[in-house]
Amino acid sequence: MENEPDTICILVDADACPVKAEIYRVAERHNLPVVIVANSFIAIPREAQRVERVVVSGNLDAADDWIAEHSRPGAVVVTADIPLASRALEKGASVIAPNGRIHTQSTIGNTLATRNLMDSLRSAGEVTGGPAPFAPKDRSAFLSALDLAIVRLKRAGFHAS
């Protein structure tokens, strides 16, 4: 992964990411490097350009730790993991959930508090189930959010390497 401070890169929490194919297409269009980080082997299509695979081992949070450690201004982090989103934002990265939700410093506190509350309610048996299933509108929202994040970074002076 190119780690020049003024370049754009995409870091993907890949184990359960439903939008990897979309990330590859957008990255290719913008000539951006992508790092797929996972706890196990993830296949990357041959035609995907500039994609690096990082397989981490160890604890369940090893992929999150790797992504948080490599987050920086100019990085776009794609994750559904709220604590990881918070850590990446602290490092100055742009963060997008696979459903297209853009996390910011001003929204992550409430999002993290809601996540923690729902975890507590699930543990107490008050709430069952989880988030809604991934839908086509989520894929479309994600593509829009990723393009928007890249455009904003380019306007801020970051560039493709």
Curated annotation (Swiss-Prot):
Name of protein: UPF0178 protein BOV_1904
Native organism: Brucella ovis (strain ATCC 25840 / 63/290 / NCTC 10512)
InterPro entries membership: UPF0178
Secretion signal span: none
Pfam families the record matches: DUF188
CDD domains in the cross-refs: PIN_YqxD-like
HAMAP family, per the entry: UPF0178
UniProt similarity note: Belongs to the UPF0178 family.
